[in-house]
Amino acid sequence: MTGVDEILNYKRNPDDDYYALLGCDENSTVEQITAEYKVLALQYHPDKNDGDKEAEAKFQQLKEAKETLCEPSKRALYDKWRQSGIAMGFKQWLGMKDHVQQSMHWSKPNTKDRMLEGEPGKPSGPSSLGPSNPGARRASEGGAALWGRWGAGNQEPPSEVISKFRNYEI
């Protein structure tokens, strides 16, 4: 099967979802991931399941998932692959990541809804520290961060034309 056929006929393997494999969420901390791993590793460890090939394979998957999710650089790559929705496995994507990422510059990362809603009409989070105009919002919230990191400083606001251009309104 060629690489293109593999991509076109790709069916996502549930074992590729490291978060589900470990019983974690994408917002889990390294400590939470490690704790979940320890519980499952004890259950599937080859010493406790002598001769059980399935338990040994599961243990190897758990180990790989933990190693990937506990190292920040690997986790960032894994999350990028997971959110891309691209039709290939994580290992295949890793082998081609430099080529694939060149064509993913347009993709928008999936973000979860915020747990706490601010007051209606009032922004919440880091954007509430700076100006509340659309140009000061993060790009993921429908605006470009034109005011620098937190909107502090003595910067003058950009012209209306520049704001519209940067927000893809013209």
Curated annotation (Swiss-Prot):
Domain J: 17-82
Signal sequence bounds: none
PROSITE patterns, A to Z: DNAJ_2 (PS50076)
Chaperone listed as a keyword: yes
Cellular component aspect of the GO annotation: cytoplasm
Region (Disordered): 101-170
SUPFAM superfamilies assigned: Chaperone J-domain
Segments of skewed composition (Low complexity): 121-135, 142-153
Database matches in Gene3D superfamilies: DnaJ domain
Matching SMART domains: DnaJ (SM00271)
Keywords recorded for this protein, A-Z: Chaperone
Compositionally biased tracts (Basic and acidic residues): 110-120
InterPro entries listed in its UniProt record: DnaJ_domain (IPR001623), J_dom_sf (IPR036869), JDP1-like (IPR029827)
Alphabetical list of PANTHER family matching this protein: DNAJ HOMOLOG SUBFAMILY C MEMBER 12
Name recorded for this polypeptide: J domain-containing protein
Taxonomic source organism: Manduca sexta (Tobacco hawkmoth)
Name of encoding gene: jdp
